[in-house]
Amino acid sequence: MAESFSFDVVSDFDRQELVNTLDQVKREISQRYDLKGTDTSVELDKENIFIITNSELTLNAVNDIIRQKAIKRNLSLKIFDYGETEMVSGNRIKQTILLKQGIKQEIAKKISKNIRDQIKKINVSINGETLRVASKSKNDLQLAIKLVSELEESLNIPLKANNFR
């Protein structure tokens, strides 16, 4: 029997699910009557989604479609950080949506401190953009997982517990 049990706290998303979501969004934009002829484009690069369209109304409709499709594909809406809209050539509007991935150092420290304050017999180590939570008791780890899910709401970042060993 193992002497110590552990799990990792990560903040990431399934990139293929995001690609599939944006494919569905593009398909709906091309088929919806109110969005036809708006010359709307949705592009994905490594860290951002770019939406270029004709009007604020169309931009809001596209953002709603992205949210709906992301929820259906089990993507957390917390991965989207909506940027400001800006005017580009030809009276068009561009919005950049930053994709949140990884746990920043200061947030990792907050999570670590919070877990240690609540559960005494637990070890939390920060490994780059992940946290490793270890304990000799599975019950303590289950409490830590519950605590992480509660912290997810207050920190406004998507957190997952994985690699439970």
UniProtKB/Swiss-Prot annotation:
A Pfam short name: DUF520
Presence of the UniProt keyword Nucleotide-binding in the record: yes
Entry GO CC: cytosol
Molecular-function annotations in GO: nucleotide binding
Keywords on record: Nucleotide-binding
Entry-linked InterPro entries: DUF520 (IPR007551), UPF0234-like_C (IPR035571), UPF0234_N (IPR035570), YajQ-like_sf (IPR036183)
NCBIfam families listed in its UniProt record: PRK05412.1
Known function: Nucleotide-binding protein.
Family statement drawn from the similarity comment of this UniProt entry: Belongs to the YajQ family.
Protein name as it appears in the record: Nucleotide-binding protein A9601_05361
Species annotation: Prochlorococcus marinus (strain AS9601)
